[in-house]
Structures are given as structure tokens and as C-alpha cells.
Design a protein with these regions (language model features):
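Helix-loop boundary elements of multi-pass alpha-helical membrane proteins
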Residues: 28-66, 129-151, 210-218, 224-234, ...
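N-terminal signal-anchor/initial transmembrane insertion module
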Residues: 1-104
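Juxtamembrane loop-transmembrane helix junctions in multi-pass integral membrane proteins
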Residues: 51-54, 58, 108-118, 141, ...
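Membrane-embedded alpha-helices of multi-pass membrane proteins, especially ion channels
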Residues: 15-30, 72-89, 124-139, 157-171, ...
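Hydrophobic alpha-helical transmembrane segments of polytopic
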Residues: 10, 63-73, 120-127, 150, ...
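Intramembrane catalytic core of multi-pass membrane enzymes that act on lipidic substrates
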Residues: 59-62, 80-163, 167-168
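Transmembrane helix-loop junctions in multipass membrane proteins, especially transporters and channels
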Residues: 86, 139-143, 170-174, 209-213, ...
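Hydrophobic transmembrane alpha-helices
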Residues: 1-26, 157, 176-302
């Protein structure tokens, strides 16, 4: 089965992230434009600030837009999918055209269980709903910026995720098929990991928000401070670590047999590991009391 357009998109973006990392830190470390396009938030605060490059920046709080878009798109797809499953009403033709484009040049559906596909979409729905809530009511964003490249990439992920997942199914004859014994084990393990990672990520974001709030919940500062407690005792970036676990859980549910889900999972893995390494290095340089045994993203490993 050929690599689909949807999967190819995320493979290319994964390679682009790796390429940019080496360009910024090894090949052209003094080219400000590359650094401004690649680095985000506190990682770029001490660099030069040519006003012309502000054109490529957006507020970091715009991360909220990712999850708002994800809620709208994913909820819409779940509603349309429910109509297909319950009432046998096919997806609207424009939506089918999007699916066909993302799955091209393939025409034969993947052999992934329909039940597993639905579970992945439900997991993504829970993820974007929770993250949207956290961005609006938990997180306290600094006044730092991200590049428009990161912003567009984030929008693209949450715009295409659900469609990429559904594109490889037989969406005209979608069925909630059963799963075999191994499939059931994968569903149970994947769902357990998903809820565990989601809970730990929520705890992590509360720890980060408390660094900028008083005991009464009033925002006191927007500084970057050294977090402690929870998974921060083991890694510098537990929010990135748990994000990796969440998309790993989705791939476990589909038994690593869904091309697009795997491609997106690899993109998340590579992107979060690179961002974690840079953030870890920033903490070590800026805090003398930084714990020596704390890793970047994977406890006890990296």
C-alpha cells in the first residue's frame, strides 16, 4: 500500500522539523531569521530582536486556537460519522472528496477495525476539549511569541487529524466492527495509557500555572520560573512527555496499523523531543539550582 497524501504530509513536516533543528544549531547558528522561525517562547527571548522579524511572530497564547479548531472539526466529524453508523447517511460529497484526496493514491481501505477508528476519534475529541479548557481557564501564558510557522503547523495538525484517520476507512460502508482478542488487549492498554497520560498532563499544567498565580488564584507574574513537583521531579518537560504518550496510546488502539495515525504519532514524537531538549538546555543555563538528575523528556533516559 502506497504512502498516502495525508501520511506523506506529516512525514515531510517531521523531516522539516529535524532539518530546521540542524540548520539553526549547527549550520547557520547566527542567522536570526531561521532562529526566529524555529524557536518559541522563552527559548528566543535573549536573541536579537530586529523589528522586521516581528512580522513572523504571533502571541504564544494563540496556542488556544489549535484546540478551538480541533473541537470544531473533530466534533463535526464525529456527528457526521454517527449519522453514517446509525442512520446510514453517507458523508457529504465535499467531505468524501477530502478523504479521497488525503488517502490518494490508494483506493483500497486499510484493514483497521472500525471500532478502533472511532475510539481514536473519541480520544482526540477528549484531548482537544481538555486542552481547550486548560488554555482558557488553567494556563497563564507569558507575553512571549511563537513564529507563524509553528502556528500554521499547529492549525494544520488539528485541522487534518480526524480526516486523516477516517480517510483510509471504507467511509461509505462504515461499520462498528468487533475486535479480536489481541485487538481488545490493545484497546484496553491504549485507553488506560491515554487516560493516565491525560491526567498527568493536566496535573503538569496546573503546576505550571501555579508558578504565576497566588494562593487565591490571582495572576501575579508572567515570568519563566523553575517548576517542581509531579513529573517535573523526573523531566523538564512532562507536558511534552505526556503528549507523546497520548499519541502513542492512539497508535496502540489501532495496533500501529493505521498509516496516518502512525505518521502523526512520529511527528509528535520528533517535535516534542526536539522542543524538550532545547527547553531542558534553557533551564540548565538559567537556573543554578537545576536538579542534575532531571532528564529532558523521558524519565531516567533522555
Amino acid at each position: 500500500m502506497a504512502v498516502s497524501v495525508g501520511s506523506g504530509l506529516w512525514i515531510i513536516l517531521t523531516l522539516a522539523v529535524v532539518l530546521f533543528y540542524f540548520l539553526v544549531f549547527d549550520v547557520f547558528p547566527k542567522v536570526e531569521l531561521l532562529a526566529r522561525l524555529f524557536l518559541i517562547g522563552k527559548l528566543r527571548e535573549k536573541g536579537n530582536r530586529s523589528k522586521i522579524f516581528n512580522l513572523f511572530d504571533v502571541p504564544k497564547r494563540w496556542f488556544t486556537h489549535f484546540y478551538m479548531l480541533g473541537v470544531v472539526v473533530n466534533t463535526s466529524l464525529l456527528i457526521l460519522l454517527a449519522r453514517v453508523v446509525v442512520f446510514r447517511v453517507p458523508f457529504p460529497q465535499p467531505v468524501q472528496n477530502i478523504f479521497n484526496t488525503l488517502w490518494a493514491p490508494n483506493h483500497t481501505p486499510e484493514g483497521v477495525s472500525g471500532t478502533a477508528v472511532v475510539l481514536v476519534l473519541v480520544m482526540e475529541e477528549l484531548q482537544v476539549l481538555r486542552r481547550c479548557y486548560e488554555c482558557l481557564f488553567v494556563s497563564v501564558f507569558s507575553d512571549s511569541k511563537i513564529s507563524v510557522v509553528h502556528y500554521i503547523m499547529g492549525l494544520l495538525l488539528y485541522l487534518t487529524f480526524g480526516s486523516c484517520i477516517l480517510a483510509s476507512t471504507d467511509f461509505n460502508n462504515f461499520r462498528m466492527t468487533g475486535v479480536d482478542q489481541m485487538g481488545l488487549v490493545c484497546v484496553v492498554v491504549g485507553c488506560f495509557l491515554f487516560f493516565l497520560a491525560s491526567m498527568l498532563q493536566h496535573q503538569t499544567l496546573h503546576i505550571l500555572s501555579k508558578l504565576r498565580k497566588s494562593h487565591s488564584g490571582v495572576v501575579e507574574n508572567r515570568q519563566h520560573l523553575l517548576p517542581n513537583g509531579g513529573l517535573f521531579e523526573y523531566v523538564s518537560c512532562p507536558h511534552f512527555f505526556t503528549e507523546i504518550l497520548i499519541y502513542l496510546a492512539m497508535n496502540i488502539v489501532v495496533q500501529f496499523q493505521h498509516q496516518a495515525c502512525l505518521s502523526i504519532g512520529i511527528f509528535v514524537l520528533v517535535n516534542q523531543v526536539i522542543m524538550s531538549l532545547m527547553t531542558h538546555d534553557w533551564y540548565r543555563k538559567n537556573f543554578r539550582m537545576f536538579p542534575k538528575d532531571r532528564k529532558a523528556v523521558f524519565p531516567y533516559l533522555l
